Each structure stands twice: as structure tokens, then as C-alpha cells.
Amino acid sequence: MPKGSSDKLYEITPGLELKVRPESIGGTPANRMIHRESNQLFIGPYVINEKGIVRVIPYSAMFGRPTANARHLSDPAGRIYSASMEEALYEIDVKSLAVTPLYRDEQDKTPGPKADLPGYHGKGMYSGQGRLVYANNGENSAEARRDPFIDSGVLAEWDGKDWKVVRRTQFTEVTGPGGIYGNENPATDPLWSIGWDAKSLILMLLDGREWHSYRLPKASHSYDGAHGWNTEWPRIREIGEGDDLLMTMHGMFWRFPKNFSLANTSGIAPRSSYLKVIGDFCRWQDRLVFGCDDTAKSEFLNKRRAKGEVAAPQSQSNLWFVDPEKLDHLGPVLGRGLVWLKEDVAAGTKSDPYLFGGLKNRALHLVHTGAAELSLALEVDREGKGIWEPLRTEVIPPNGYLFTGFKDDETGVWIRLVPSVDATGLTAAFTNKGDDERAAAGETPLKFAGISSVSDGESSARSGGVIRARSENKRNLHFAAKTTEGSLGLYTLSDTLTLTPETNPEELGWLEKHAAIPSREGVITTDAASVIYTDDAGKRFRLPRGNAAFDRAGPLGGERLCREVATERDLFNCHGTFFELPAENAAGFSRVRPVATHGLRIVDYCSYRGLLVVSGVDLALAGENRHIIRSSDGKTGLWVGAIDDLWELGKPVGS
């Protein structure tokens, strides 16, 4: 929304009272910066001083979707930069708020210079070491909306006169140790940018006016996609943990050292995996607050036959308040990344450094297509000081494959590979996984008590049915409840989480038709070996079987297989296991990630105002579980929680 919208600027009081600010002009902002000298917060088109007084920069003066702010190169006390997602660059006077366009937004028809950078969908921006660094993470083409592996995105720098491409691939955050304030010593403090390509995450470091690159593993592939829409805004931010910053990237919480520089590259480590899609976060009082993108209106490009007609009519995003201790206790750490992918590599070429420290259960897969055996030297930087030493040498058979694991006493911060001779078709893929201490699916955890189980007998207290959040700011959810004996009618879940029956045959009929659970015919089959999923292109994928009871429909009939509950990816519930399923434009089912295995008879699920809502409840088994919302007439109920509660169901298992 480059000209503003009906969206609001909100203020939340310490007592969690939500206030709509009258200065609201909407738009699609992702920028925030505190200007030290004037003690003002620049967030979106708003400028807020220490007394809470809000001033507004109209979109007529600063056209575009604001994505990032940065300290000025020559007048940091008096001006700041602001950039849009479509490559506009503006100067803002911090006192008068006068705006000077330096480069026009790509959607702006006003005459003026354009940056004309490669890529699309701007993200982070930061200044230091005599330059302004800007990142985008997409490509604006029909091909980019289909193929996640084309050239896309850019990391670029501007010296006050000219733009220069640093690296032609997808980048998001750009920041430094100064964080939201900007670097205290801009001439010497480092800058960091996080991005990715088809092989891995890419961390770029600007230190001593030179760029250096490092590779990290991906936990999730649902963030891939050449158009750049699937990431939202990964960040590296301070959360009150001293010199440890928090980085969010590709479904993993990362510990990121505030002193990361060329002289000290140690300290980066994964903390846990997550399913939410996070746009920003901060520490507030005793909680971390994550701004999340849950189900998107109409699902954008995330369509597939397995879902049927079930797109949310209105976005359901919200804030997620989390105890900081939980950062280390969500999903288990998982990582996959490559340094080469089917590439011809000259003898003596050193790969990018790949993260080696802070990971467990590490392994390396090597493939090449050369006619002779290939010797690869493995080298490590043991302390992150840039001093490399031999670890060992691996020899791949002619036109062959080699797997090797790493022992716990094979230590180092980074690892790199060096071929002894010219290599053809060389692939080097690293994997790692944390210790998954969750129990295998068995007794249902108390948090999920009351959700019907495959082991439950016939029960008159069992109910379920299709659910769907409503549109036009009604801020409620409709539920077509039924038991094994027939329909209970329509129920409404309010924004205060009360569930009440409603007499409205027309709405009930509409819901049962338009949120119907689609047939699994041609999508899911089973044989003696496994479960078989067939995607929209006819490709077949095999999944492990869970409890044999899932071979049959449940007591209440069909059960939801697939639905978007976090933006631009799906939650896939098949044969007793939840999976994170990337959109088709992020390579779809070939990049699926298992989450947890359960023995639950879940009829339907969706996101509602940031919550995960589940139908398929047996009130007789709910006890005092506060996650169960009981209807006012006592006949039915729904389970509510966060999507990341699902990790607690147990480790993925099957046969």
C-alpha cells in the first residue's frame, strides 16, 4: 500500500490495553529506527518523541512501502535515510520532517531518478564504513513466482553517488552492533547482512571496508521462493541478553554475537526451530514480543488441491508473547546446507566457510561426476580467528558418492573444503540435527487434553466440524459443530474467546459448503509400505505410516489434511504426523519438514487472530485444560493455542 491504507498505528499499555492512534494513515511499513540525537523513533511513516507525541510524514511526501531506515552518511545528527520496498530512497530532516527524494519508488510515476537495482522487494538497510547498504530478496517476474532457483535479489551499496552490486542473491536483514540506533562508530564498526541461495543461508560481513561471506544451514525451506514473499522480515536484534543478539532466519532462532567481526567470528549457534512466520520482535517487560504473519487473506500464491476452498477471507496475524526461556525449547535444531551444488570447481578453490561449531550430529555428503577419484581437503578455523588448519582428507570414488560423519572431538567454528584437482559436477552437502529429547507419540500431553484420540472409545461428548475465521473485521470465527449423531448447528467463537450457539441456517450452510474438507481421492493413498501423497503436478512422495487407525476415516468423517496457518506455507496433518509444507513456489512437498507425531483425531484446524484453533474435542476428557474453550451450552468445544505448541506432541515417528 504505497499511498497508505486503513491499517492502524497501535499503542499497547503496560496493562495490555490496545489503543488505536488517531494519527494512523496505514500503509505497509517494516522500518524502525531510534535517532539518538533527537531521541525520536522513526517507525513506518510516524515519528514519535520521548513524550509519546506522534508526527506523521504523509505518503504524498514519501511514496512507497517503507522498509528500512538508516543513519545519514554526512549529516547523521540532522537527517536520516528511509527506503521503500520498491527502491525509493529519501532523506528526512529529523526536526522539520521535510523529505528529499534521492531515488523514486519503482511504482511512483513522478519524474526523477531510479536506483534500477537488480531484484525486487526491499528489506533491510544500514549505513557504515562510508556506504549505505540495501538488501532485497526477490524478483518481480512470472518465472520467479514459479521457480525458486532462478537468480533473484541483491545486496547493494551506495556511496552517496553511485550504486554497486555486492552480491546477486536474496538478502533480508542489514544491521550492525548498534542495532536499532545505528552503529556508534560508523567508520569502523562492522555491518552484517543475512540472506540465502539454493544452497544455504549466506551471512555477509563488512569489516575493514571489505566484504566476507559465510554459510549457515537452513532449518526450513518454506522461506525459499524467488519472488521473496515467503520470508517476511528476518531480523538480528537485541533482546536483553547482553552480548547475545537474536537472529531469526529460515525457521530457526539463532544466537548471534554482538562482537561478530573478522577478528572474532565465533559464537553463532542455533537455539531452536519454530513454525511461526516472524516479521519483527523486541523485548518488552518480561516477555519477547514477536510480530507474526499468520494466515494471509486469500493465501496469495499458496494454492494446492489438498486444501480445497478454504482460504482465509481476512489476514489473521497477531502478536506472540513468549517467555525468553522458551527460545531454547521449541522445535529441535535441524540444519541442511551446501557449499557446492553440481558445480565445476577448479583445483585449490576454497569453498565458503560453513558453520561447524555449535552444531551436533554433523555429517557431510559428497558427490562428483569426474572419471577419476577426487581428493578433498577439509580445513577448519578452530577459534573463529581466520586461522585455518587441516582437519582431514576425504577421497570420493570416480563418478561416485561419499558419506562421512564428524566426531564430537572434531572441533572448529568454521569448515571449508578444497579439491586437489579440477572437479566436475561437485556437490558438498552438510547436515546436522540437535538432540531431540521429546518422547515418541504416546500419552497425550496435558496441554492437548480433550482433543479426541484414536484410542478413545465411542463418546457422546466427542464433537468436531469445519471452522473458518470471518471477514470484514467481524473478528470472530464460525464453527459447524457435529457429533456422531448429527449436526449441533452453528457456533461463533468471539474475540474474547467465548463459544456460543447461533441460529443462522444460511451461514451454517455457507460454511459447510465453502469450508468443506475436500476428498483425499487422488491425493492420499496407502499401501503396505507407506502413505503416498500425490501433488498437483502428479509427483508422488512417500511418508511414514502412523497408527493403523488413520487408514480409516474418523468417527466424525473426513479430517483436514492441509491448511495454511502461517503465511505462505501449509500445515499438513497426515497419518498422525504434522508437517510444515512449503508453498509450491518454494519447491513444495520435496522440501517438507516433519514437526510432531500424535494420536489425535483432529477434524479441522485454522489460524484465528494469531491462534491455532483445532476442532475434534471430547469434553469428557478435557478436565481443567485451559486450552479448551467450552461452548456456553456445554455441547461442544474447541482447542486453542499457538502453532508452535505442536512441537510438544512428540518427536516424529512412523514406519
Short names for language-model regions:
Residues G26-S38, M62-A77, Q107-G130, R167-P190, ...:
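Repeated scaffold domains used in trafficking and secretory/extracellular systems
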Residues Y401-D408:
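Exposed aromatic-hydrophobic patches
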